[in-house]
From Swiss-Prot:
SUPFAM superfamilies: Adenine nucleotide alpha hydrolases-like, Class I glutamine amidotransferase-like, GMP synthetase C-terminal dimerisation domain. PROSITE patterns: GATASE_TYPE_1 (PS51273), GMPS_ATP_PPASE (PS51553). Pathway: Purine metabolism; GMP biosynthesis; GMP from XMP (L-Gln route): step 1/1. PANTHER family: GMP SYNTHASE [GLUTAMINE-HYDROLYZING], GMP SYNTHASE-RELATED. The lineage of its organism: Bacteria, Pseudomonadati, Pseudomonadota, Alphaproteobacteria, Hyphomicrobiales. It comes from the Bacteria. One of its GO terms (cellular component) is cytosol. This is GMP synthase [glutamine-hydrolyzing]. The gene is guaA.
Length: 540
């Protein structure tokens, strides 16, 4: 469950607050200069998978970040601009003259080549999607991965192309739409690829990036969750001192890990507030209370506000309206309980690194809102409290790894994402207590089936939806007129795109039979085979 653990940083960071994470100076670091690519975050994640801390900064702030961060290497991301434009984004020359290894990707290759004296031209043939490159010479990036003379699949997304190399560079690969697909300056340790090595569609991309990190930059990889845990505890103690911290606990991964980490640092100076809005999964409230109050002995205030929330949602059918009502009411209830606790100086939030990245956009302009995100964005200003955000340096997969390091049960650490508004957005149309009970029970049966089949960890997210329609059925000798349950399961790496999970029909048939037999009020079950895009993962 994301609320209140994964707020959008643009809405929660107070005016003037520091928006960059800080990592101990002892760690090896790679700076990623962002030119606006939609997949820049993947570069950072791939680097961290190699045990090296990476940080993304927009190109406008790259020179200052480089001076402060003192990275061991730099990666230039892709981007939507053309280096041929008069106002094209560029890498700071101070970075290119600093003597550290540099890797350019797509736009990063083009700007590196152009800035160092090469030529870039508009391509006669654009390359978008899967492409094949031929390796024309050996290169440190290819060591142990690709051989001279071989051809390999990659993912391209470009219009411009490098046509003349800067002094000191050599071309080491070619493709039909980009005759100089990979460039190398071995003396300066400058390398660049026209293709996107960070995406899964380039099968050997991770290995090539590993070669840059390990063999070119010579980094050993000291970024571990064990080290992070120790450093985070010291930072929390230094920040909080003898102050009191209040943490909104949702039952989701982020808030759970943040709470346990903070409690390990400051003990009973932390109080958690768990607001049950009545739209949680089956037995979820009991599980949260048992784990945090009885197992970890964390001071916990459990508020059953289900009647308040359901009353406010009565008659509401618009999904955006539901989200806004739940978000505002959550703030009201949390604020009231925080005042009862009293004396808190700090508000703990499970802000993650992607939230921090999103707060500094490439263009500085607005983006289209597909769905509003439920968070506690109004709390810091409203409660006049300082923020404690111990996870702000981490990606989601790192949070899970930290949770395991802290000893959190796998049922918490490995659970599928759950939306802040909970079952409210899995119950299209008006929400009632009866509908929520039906949905809660159907969802529990579905997840139980998935776990028994050993499929839970192979699926990014799975859940049931209660449709706002009834259909005719036959049970025994009688006619029924009951609800339809939709089942959804998707595979994904980051939630940005997703494919439906291809269950076999025997599994779906057995699951449908169990739901209809065990859940009163349901007489039909359907399976959603929509990918994202065009659909979204959630129904509302």
């Amino acid at each position: 469950m994301t609320a209140p653990s994964t707020p959008s940083a643009s809405s929660v960071v107070p005016s003037g607050a520091d928006t960059s994470p800080h990592v101990a100076a002892i760690h090896e670091k790679i700076l990623i200069v962002d030119f606006g690519s939609q997949v820049t975050q993947l570069i950072a994640r791939r680097v961290r998978e190699e045990g090296v801390y990476s940080e993304i900064v927009p190109f406008q702030k790259a020179e200052a970040a480089f001076a402060e961060m003192k990275p061991k290497a730099v990666i230039l991301s892709g981007g939507p601009a053309s280096v041929l434009d008069a106002d094209a984004p560029a890498a700071p020359m101070a970075i290119l003259e600093a003597g550290v290894p540099v890797l350019g990707i797509c736009y990063g290759e083009q700007t590196l080549a152009k800035q160092l004296g090469g030529t870039v031209e508009a391509g006669h043939h654009r390359e978008f999607g899967r492409a094949t490159i031929e390796i024309t010479d050996d290169c440190a990036l290819f060591d142990g991965v690709w051989q001279k003379g071989g051809t390999y699949d990659v993912w391209m997304s470009h219009g411009d192309r490098v046509t003349k190399l800067p002094d000191g560079f050599r071309g080491v690969a070619k493709a039909p739409g980009s005759p100089i697909s990979v460039i190398a300056d071995d003396k300066r340790k400058f390398y660049a690829t026209q293709f996107h090595l960070e995406v899964v569609h380039t099968p050997d991309g991770a290995k090539i990036l590993r070669n840059f990190v390990r063999k070119v930059a010579g980094l050993t990889g000291d970024w571990t969750m064990r080290a992070f845990r120790e450093e985070a505890i010291e930072k929390i103690r230094a920040q909080v001192g003898t102050g009191k911290v209040i943490c909104g606990l949702s039952g989701g991964v982020d808030s759970a890990v943040a709470a346990v980490l903070i409690h390990e640092a400051i003990g009973d100076q932390l109080t958690c507030v768990f607001v049950d809005h009545g739209m949680l999964r089956k037995d979820e409230a009991k599980t949260v209370v048992d784990l945090f109050r009885h197992h970890y002995n964390i001071p916990l205030v459990h508020v059953d506000a289900s009647e308040t929330f359901l009353g406010a949602l009565s008659g509401v059918t618009d999904p955006e309206q539901k989200r806004k009502i739940i978000g505002k009411l959550f703030i009201d209830v949390f604020d009231a309980e925080a005042k009862v606790v009293g004396g808190a100086d700090y508000l703990a939030q499970g802000t993650l690194y992607p939230d921090v990245i999103e707060s500094v956009s490439f263009t500085g302009g607005p983006s289209v809102t597909i769905k509003s995100h439920h968070n506690v964005g109004g709390l810091p200003e409203r409660m006049n409290m300082k923020l404690v955000e111990p996870l702000r340096e981490l990606f989601k997969d790192e949070v899970r790894a930290l949770g395991r390091e802290l000893g959190l049960p796998e049922i918490f650490v490995g659970r599928h994402p759950f939306p802040g508004p909970g079952l409210a957005i899995r119950c299209p149309g008006e929400i009632t207590a009866e509908k929520l009970d039906i949905l809660r029970n159907a969802d529990a049966v579905y997840i139980d089936q998935i776990r028994k089949a050993g499929l839970y960890d192979a699926i990014w997210q799975a859940f049931a939806v209660l449709l706002p329609v009834k259909t005719v059925g036959v049970m025994g000798d009688g006619r029924t007129y009951e609800y339809v349950v939709g089942l959804r399961a998707v595979t994904s790496t980051d939630g940005m795109t997703a494919d439906y999970y291809p269950f076999d029909m025997a599994f779906l048939g057995a699951t449908a039979t169990r739901i209809i037999n065990e859940v009163k009020g349901v007489n039909r079950v359907v399976y959603d085979v929509t990918s994202k895009p065009p659909g979204t993962i959630e129904w509302e």
